[in-house]
């Protein structure tokens, strides 16, 4: 730790009235670009307008101005998020059966959307129980509301109004911090202050206030709800907060106030800050006393972390010093220069953040089913499937975004003259070794993982089940995964004092939690079938990484095109007269990477959906016999490609295909429509620009004949625009098809 003399006291960190507010300016399309502001001559103008509106780098090269625009845009984004959240709460208040669900969450299904009868579509309002007709929702909002202690639709209504107030506040802040008091560049680059505020403020105080809410409001209300008390009889949140005796009746240690805290007798608080592990048998969710304890612990960690970095007091760590101290025996200058990169290139910063947030989102997807955090979430199979699928897709997109912005950084912000022998330079210098090895790994994984399936299909087709890779013939058990499962199942006795169960029931140990005759969670067995599909996961993920990493490492130059940096981030080919140079831009790698990301995530969500229906989800009889939705057919059926097609895709599509005439029919229409959107994408992906330009000119001729030709000259999409439209429809169509397939199936059988 370095002690320095204190900094000068007051720095002026904002510019006042930096840019005047002008509605005339905003009303002029393309006001941010000299070329676009001239107005449309050809139809390409509208595409350029969309491509460049938020590409602040193209408006100006002044880093301070770019930073201010990004900062202001973030407030706009937050305002939209608050507006959306407010809408969710408003639907809960105005169009939902929340209060009915709260009184009987095992038999009544959540609904917060009611279709108006205009052309007979009120058929979509299915009977969700409790005398309510509406569309069953699978977002998990009801479960979150119960966990936070919301007991009436009036409370939802008030929260919705609060959301609108915050949305307005954010819009104002976005305007204020760009037009009235715009921060200087030095403020954006003061990373130590930023870390302290984000760690201690957002994460530390955020977690602490949530822990406080859980202890003083959620826990007591949920305690009453679990005991079967009518929600209308439960005291209101402010009564618990203001009246300590109320809480002391439920949690005796409250009677002692803060004395145990200051006398370090913390174990007194163990009645509401627990460390049990496992699930609450009443609700099938994590113990809320465990989650309150968790948020308190997280808050302490982040409050400490938020006091580690050196600001005005000359004490603590400096980020630059930390980075420059990172030097290994084989890493040359190590992290020297990284500080400058991350404080002057927001693309580099964003790339790191997207990579971490994407990975974290995928971790969340897995925790939502393995450790279901909210009451009655685990037995709501539609919501479980939706939350997993949603977080997997989002994680995939964020990780591709990380590669996109890393490549933009390489093209626009990387300065090779100042970087020598630091880690990034060394990675770039042996990029051929990295990419060729990665390519070898992809080939190995592809042939071997696919080969195992092809072997099984062949043996199955020839009627030789004894020669197949399966749990009953030639076993390929995932021994490492099973070892990890067993270690965790045995851990509570050895690691966490007072923990009565392991972190997740999925690890093993024979415990099963069922709520209202439905399985919430049980140990998930892994076998040969999982071993096979896990290697498909490894294959698709490695190919995605290969494409994206090649795009980043060869963004500035390659043997084929040494001056690639001069061509920019996205370009169709290296100019006329140079054949075989198409699809080499960094943008094209992102484009191709998106398809493989789609492959990867599709296999993951198919695996999850079938595995859970086969081995986890189902009903339990009074005798304790579990009947799974698909009767445990995953282990024997998913070991052939034919099995995936026959017993998963085809067998489980019957609900969506036969949904016409029922309340699920919207999913049938979506299934059809999304297939069409997906097929429509192929038209953009398989045809070249010239084909369309010829067709357009013929159509323009006809318009001229009839004297109805437009003033703006029609143009075919550019090559890059065509690819962008193609991949968008491909992903949108594919994801919406999967969504309709999953939901119609799980709502019908779950």
Curated annotation (Swiss-Prot):
<keyword id="KW-0479">Metal-binding</keyword>
<feature type="transmembrane region" description="Helical; Name=IX">
    <location>
        <begin position="589"/>
        <end position="610"/>
    </location>
</feature>
<feature type="transmembrane region" description="Helical; Name=X">
    <location>
        <begin position="664"/>
        <end position="686"/>
    </location>
</feature>
<feature type="transmembrane region" description="Helical; Name=VII">
    <location>
        <begin position="433"/>
        <end position="455"/>
    </location>
</feature>
<feature type="binding site">
    <location>
        <position position="573"/>
    </location>
    <ligand>
        <name>[4Fe-4S] cluster</name>
    </ligand>
</feature>
<feature type="transmembrane region" description="Helical; Name=V">
    <location>
        <begin position="346"/>
        <end position="369"/>
    </location>
</feature>
<feature type="transmembrane region" description="Helical; Name=VIII">
    <location>
        <begin position="531"/>
        <end position="549"/>
    </location>
</feature>
<keyword id="KW-0812">Transmembrane</keyword>
<keyword id="KW-0004">4Fe-4S</keyword>
<keyword id="KW-0603">Photosystem I</keyword>
<dbReference type="GO" id="GO:0009522">
    <property type="term" value="C:photosystem I"/>
</dbReference>
<feature type="binding site">
    <location>
        <position position="692"/>
    </location>
    <ligand>
        <name>phylloquinone</name>
    </ligand>
</feature>
<keyword id="KW-0813">Transport</keyword>
<feature type="binding site" description="axial binding residue">
    <location>
        <position position="683"/>
    </location>
    <ligand>
        <name>chlorophyll a</name>
    </ligand>
</feature>
<keyword id="KW-0249">Electron transport</keyword>
<feature type="transmembrane region" description="Helical; Name=VI">
    <location>
        <begin position="385"/>
        <end position="411"/>
    </location>
</feature>
<dbReference type="GO" id="GO:0009535">
    <property type="term" value="C:chloroplast thylakoid membrane"/>
</dbReference>
<keyword id="KW-0408">Iron</keyword>
<dbReference type="InterPro" id="IPR001280">
    <property type="entry name" value="PSI_PsaA/B"/>
</dbReference>
<dbReference type="Pfam" id="PF00223">
    <property type="entry name" value="PsaA_PsaB"/>
</dbReference>
<dbReference type="GO" id="GO:0016168">
    <property type="term" value="F:chlorophyll binding"/>
</dbReference>
<dbReference type="GO" id="GO:0000287">
    <property type="term" value="F:magnesium ion binding"/>
</dbReference>
<keyword id="KW-0460">Magnesium</keyword>
<dbReference type="InterPro" id="IPR006243">
    <property type="entry name" value="PSI_PsaA"/>
</dbReference>
<keyword id="KW-0157">Chromophore</keyword>
<comment type="subunit">
    <text>The PsaA/B heterodimer binds the P700 chlorophyll special pair and subsequent electron acceptors. PSI consists of a core antenna complex that captures photons, and an electron transfer chain that converts photonic excitation into a charge separation. The eukaryotic PSI reaction center is composed of at least 11 subunits.</text>
</comment>
<keyword id="KW-0411">Iron-sulfur</keyword>
<dbReference type="GO" id="GO:0015979">
    <property type="term" value="P:photosynthesis"/>
</dbReference>
<feature type="transmembrane region" description="Helical; Name=III">
    <location>
        <begin position="195"/>
        <end position="219"/>
    </location>
</feature>
<comment type="similarity">
    <text>Belongs to the PsaA/PsaB family.</text>
</comment>
<dbReference type="InterPro" id="IPR020586">
    <property type="entry name" value="PSI_PsaA/B_CS"/>
</dbReference>
<feature type="transmembrane region" description="Helical; Name=II">
    <location>
        <begin position="156"/>
        <end position="179"/>
    </location>
</feature>
<feature type="transmembrane region" description="Helical; Name=I">
    <location>
        <begin position="70"/>
        <end position="93"/>
    </location>
</feature>
<feature type="binding site" description="axial binding residue">
    <location>
        <position position="675"/>
    </location>
    <ligand>
        <name>chlorophyll a'</name>
    </ligand>
</feature>
<protein>
    <recommendedName>
        <fullName>Photosystem I P700 chlorophyll a apoprotein A1</fullName>
        <ecNumber>1.97.1.12</ecNumber>
    </recommendedName>
</protein>
<dbReference type="GO" id="GO:0016491">
    <property type="term" value="F:oxidoreductase activity"/>
</dbReference>
<keyword id="KW-0472">Membrane</keyword>
<feature type="transmembrane region" description="Helical; Name=XI">
    <location>
        <begin position="724"/>
        <end position="744"/>
    </location>
</feature>
<dbReference type="GO" id="GO:0009055">
    <property type="term" value="F:electron transfer activity"/>
</dbReference>
<keyword id="KW-0934">Plastid</keyword>
<comment type="function">
    <text>PsaA and PsaB bind P700, the primary electron donor of photosystem I (PSI), as well as the electron acceptors A0, A1 and FX. PSI is a plastocyanin-ferredoxin oxidoreductase, converting photonic excitation into a charge separation, which transfers an electron from the donor P700 chlorophyll pair to the spectroscopically characterized acceptors A0, A1, FX, FA and FB in turn. Oxidized P700 is reduced on the lumenal side of the thylakoid membrane by plastocyanin.</text>
</comment>
<feature type="binding site">
    <location>
        <position position="691"/>
    </location>
    <ligand>
        <name>chlorophyll a</name>
    </ligand>
</feature>
